[in-house]
């Protein structure tokens, strides 16, 4: 459980770094190019020696984003619960996608982890305000113990043509 919280915490700081640097992605993310694709890590991920990348753009055009929770620019969980957290996540997702000149229409799959499945309707109302049909494929699960006590975590896969 501690490793999962550390991984998600790193993603929080990655999101804070990305959201402030949409116009100059190379200034905030470290990129490693390999034959299979480009791997992006935040400064925090590198400092903490986390065993994962924050975002990967494969040579085949797939873009994998590590899970996002509803944090602000300082990496702290936004107050107010599911609604504000969800909007913060979509702001982060937009910034992540912008790093590769992508948008919500380029997302093909989402994994939603929610702390209370009874809030599913509330989440869906916000989700559908960001995505338009045809919607990405999606999986969901109830999850207890998300980093920082978050109500939601969202992980996405996009395609860059």
Language-model-derived ranges and their functions:
Residues 108-110:
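Surface-exposed aromatic
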Residues 13-91, 95-105, 114-161:
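N-terminal presequence-like segments and the immediate start of the first folded domain
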Residues 2-10:
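Sec-dependent signal peptide recognition
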